[in-house]
Amino acid sequence: SGGFDFSFLPQPPQEKAGVGLGPGPMGLMGPRGPPGASGAPGPQGFQGPAGEPGEPGQTGPAGARGPAGPPGKAGPGKPGRPGERGVVGPQGARGFPGTPGLPGFKGIRGHNGLDGLKGQPGAPGVKGEPGAPGENGTPGQTGARGLPGERGRVGAPGPAGRGSDGSVGPVGPAGPIGSAGPPGFPGAPGPKGELGPVGNTGPAGPAGPRGEQGLPGVSGPVGPPGNPGANGLTGKGAAGLPGVAGAPGLPGPRGIPGPVGASGATGARGLVGEPGPAGSKGESGGKGEPGSAGPQGPPGSSGEEGKRGNGEAGSTGPTGPPGLRGGPGSRGLPGADGRAGVIGPAGARGASGPAGVRGPSGDTGRPGEPGLMGARGLPGSPGNVGPAGKEGPVGLPGIDGRPGPIGPAGARGEAGNIGFPGPKGPAGDPGKGGEKGHAGLAGNRGAPGPDGNNGAQGPPGLQGVQGGKGEQGPAGPPGFQGLPGPAGTTGEAGKPGERGIPGEFGLPGPAGPRGERGPPGESGAVGPSGAIGSRGPSGPPGPDGNKGEPGVVGAPGTAGPAGSGGPGERGAAGIPGGKGEKGETGLRGEVGTTGRDGARGAPGAVGAPGPAGATGDRGEAGAAGPAGPAGPRGSPGERGEVGPAGPNGFAGPAGAAGQPGAKGERGTKGPKGENGIVGPTGPVGSAGPAGPNGPAGPAGSRGDGGPPGVTGFPGAAGRTGPPGPSGITGPPGPPGAAGKEGLRGPRGDQGPVGRTGETGAGGPPGFTGEKGPSGEPGTAGPPGTAGPQGLLGAPGILGLPGSRGERGLPGVAGAVGEPGPLGIGPPGARGDGLPGHKGERGYAGNAGPVGAAGAPGPHGVGPAGKHGNRGEPGPVGSVGPVGALGPRGPSGPQGIRGDKGEPGEKGPRGLPGLKGHNGLQGLPGLAGQHGDQGSPGPVGPAGPRGPAGPSGPPGKDGRTGHPGAVGPAGIRGSQGSQGPSGPPGPPGPPGPPGASGGGYDFGYEGDFYRA
């Protein structure tokens, strides 16, 4: 698998041919020589290249949540006045973990208290029990197979046999090739390859089961709110050059996690531009005769910015006509961060005046070309904190800084998503050959050779005198196997010998024949239940089902008669079911097309307020009553001075689109009237009486059963049961494996001396004697002549591939070029590329002046229809010829935000895109002003605490019920958690179209700007 050429490695040596003797007389077939000695183990093979990294294992299930702290008692508190913000207190000492207390009675829900001071982070809590171990990751791919070791050397030939006549027989067959040596020890690991590029972020893994809900902790005392501090701009230091990656060091021992480091210092706040002077209040002139429209004048020059005066804020004059929009200025470098100024006292909020007269819309100026980048200015002196200036352009990205020192190990974070496997890194250099391994264990004993021919039994010799015990001589060659003698008489039973050293276990013998089936044994006692296994990995998400056909819209039912009975008693609160497990995150579908803006509905009339009735029992939420009749329009009040502009509130949710009215007949075109003076906005009519509560709706169908609960902790082991009866003796097992060869026994007594044998025949001529010693060296001869030039040698051994070079420093980003002229040409063919990332939302344009309220339209009658089915897309029309470029028309008014389109069908998963360039980092946006705190709603009384019912199965999350009637205000409780967002309000009256924004979009280098 590595793809290397191993032809350069040393090859096993070849056997040299021996010098042959003269052909001797043909002898008888001698006995087979003993097998040759096993060859020495071959050298250690090279280690193959490292295998590909295995895919990361799946994220293990989340650990069990630690025990909850004791619940706190909710004390009755009264709403306090907003005070000044206090000083942050010192960090408290770490407390001992408290024992979980009993759950207290549910207290009465109080009003939302004021935000307390942000305390310093408490001491780290006691570490919870470790979670269950995660699933083992899939094993990595097997590394490349090492080079085969050298073949064992051929054993030395056995001694030559001799025939009966003494002649040398032919050389016996070569002994069996020795078994291969044991595998060598693994070689040293090769150098670590360079890290491959970071893989794309994988899809989010399945969320672990939600932990049990802890008991509520003790509420801290409500601190007085302080004055809001000035929001400083986030400082950004210049990034240094990237450092050269050092060699990977050996992993050191894991250190003890150090304390959490202190938060870094907040960057200094940048200099803020000076505000412009407030316009002088214009006087309302008399109504003049309408003159003819004159030619358009040149745009006026923008005035210089004045410095802010020390006087109180004057009244705002009427809104003047918007001037021509100037082109964007040259792009300057970001200035140095200035020091934060002193926080001034908050000024009193002035009264809001009536809306000023709407001025005529100014002409839209053409967008200017972006100017060249100016020189970097010197840092200015720290000035007073003024109003926030406009956001400057994004600076060029700095070059990467050198890697800093390794900080202390932080707390262990939650398991991240499973990433895609990164690309395969380059193969590492082959490791050095390992040292010669130890001698391996002896191989299996070879099969016994064929039995030799039995020799003729000689006559028994005379028994000689027993000689003395001689020294142990060398072991002779194995003799011929004699015929088995007759069985002797049975001797006396010897004494039991000492127990020998148990031999090692031999190889298992062949399995014996299967015995007869024994009688069935009695059933054993039931063992204790095993521990519950860990939860397996989540399966792959199933395919999406087909979308069902939309049902027919039913006719609105008639309201049933009102029930005679009052509202029933409030039942005891059931035990909340556990939250179901979060499903796996689906693939992101393609972005649907933006729907067209729907028509804005007519506003409903505002009714007069009715008298406040007595607070009744809380009933079921009824259907909404009809709106009351519109009150009489008040007389226009005197025109007051325009008040200062209030803070920008948060954008409310878009109202539901009303039903379009019937199209009226087209009237005759009347003469063009004169522009009248816009009258002041009349007062808002009083609210109408609240409608009666409708009858209670039918009970909803019972919800589906909830998912199975989380597997509980394994129970304690049960008591050990009584011993069961003895089982029936089973059939005899198969014979055991043959034991290891025993130790060599002691040498026996020397046998009697045999008779002298007959003189044998003469032997064959002996072998050539050994080579004699070398003679003395002779004198040096004359130098020879130079030989001819030799042939070119064979090419050398192919070298190993060199290591990968270090990564070079990234080049500096080039300057942004000027945008070219707007090209005109036919539209190109539609590309087949992948959809790009959705760009960031541009900055909103300046809001136009508020127009006068339109006349209220007729109140629509009838239930709101459901959204119609989405029509099939029509056929694509043929592309017509490109028309001439017309003049740029004026920008139309901003349309009403349309309803959110239905989500499109789930598209196929696209291929992972290429890694894009790092975009320019945007400046942080200005912090919005805090809106006015709404008045807290009244809270109903708490019902009597009923007995705890049995725990039911956890159900699915039910649908949101209708809001009930508001009960009387209860005693103020402790501050609760932030509630969910309320439903969107009814659509407001349609305003007149705003002034032309005159914005334009332009982008470069992947960044999007809105002017």
Curated annotation (Swiss-Prot):
Region (Disordered): 1-1011
Bias (Low complexity): 28-67, 167-182, 292-302, 345-361, 396-415, 520-537, 549-559, 588-635, 642-662, 680-690, 711-720, 774-801, 809-819, 843-856, 872-887
Keyword Repressor in record: no
Compartments (UniProt record): Secreted; Secreted, Extracellular space; Secreted, Extracellular space, Extracellular matrix
Highest taxon of the lineage: Eukaryota
Tissue expression from the record: Expressed in bones.
Disulfide bonds: none
Ranges annotated as biased composition (Gly residues): 282-291, 323-332, 464-473, 560-578, 700-709, 757-766, 820-834
Residue(s) carrying 4-hydroxyproline: 10, 13, 35, 41, 367, 370
Function description: Type I collagen is a member of group I collagen (fibrillar forming collagen).
Additional free-text comment from the UniProt record: These protein fragments were extracted from an ancient bone collected in Haiti.
Family: Belongs to the fibrillar collagen family.
Protein name, entry field: Collagen alpha-2(I) chain
Organism encoding this protein: Neocnus comes (Miller's Hispaniolan ground sloth)
